[in-house]
Amino acid sequence: MSAVASSASPAPPSRSAGFAFILGAALSWSLAGLGIKSVPLSALSSVSLRALFALPVFAFVLWFRVRSDLPAVLRLGLSRWQTWVAALSYTFTMLSFVLASKLTTSANAILLQYTAPIYVILLSRPLLGERVGRADVLAVLGCFLGIGWFFLEQLSTSGRYGNLLALLSGASLGLLPLLLRRAEQPHPAASAQTRERLVFVPTVVLLLGNVLAALVGAPAALTGPWPGPVTWLWLAVLGVVQIGLAYLLYAAGVRRLRAVESLMLASLEPILNPLWAALGTGELPSRAALCGGLLILASVLSHGLHTTLRPKPPR
């Protein structure tokens, strides 16, 4: 979600529409757990076919926004190493999350992936030169305590592997906004036209990331069992709605709301995800998973509140 948000402009024309967009994005993202569990394919096949459905969404949006300038925008985006590293991070996030969802519960997969802000806090200074304060350290500590709570109960071997993959997915997801911010930073001598084109780098990253995801899983998709009609429907929902539509709604919503409001509303995703899975498959998260996840969410949200509401220094 951070990927598209980084390209959003800060002018909020309609707050009510902003609330609707963010809620719609959270609802769309939350379909991942149930959808992935409902697709009887290997993780690689699921990633590849889901990416194929997401590709036209991002391609159309990029074309619609830049039209005749599309070749120049693509050349600029693909010429930057940050674009490729960010796209690889995005692809790994997709693959590791799908694998984690098949090896552990949906609650563990989504809530452990939600530790992504930890890595943003830890790497902001070395990558972007941003100072890390006491509130940042406390938020990181709270998140790691929450992760420890996840592992409090005895888990099966497959559960441990799934949790590890979910943690790696969170790390790669946390790297994504940092790389995108680096990719969008223009050279001091860059022209106004180049600066305008850099705004579309996040969409280029998403487009490239889904191309890579489709290619990585293509051998498994071509040699594995052919999906039935219901499976194709779920793949379409995951690609078009859970990836494509969700990112577009979030991008529109963050333009209209304060950061803390967007953060609060988007946090419905990890709560709704295991609820959908419970309704669809009867899979219930453990008490330790719920408690640890709530501590992670509380740490992330309190950090967002502190950052947004603290007094601004006088100019």
Give the predicted meaning of each segment:
Residues 39, 46, 50, 100, ...:
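Hydrophobic/aromatic residues within transmembrane alpha-helices
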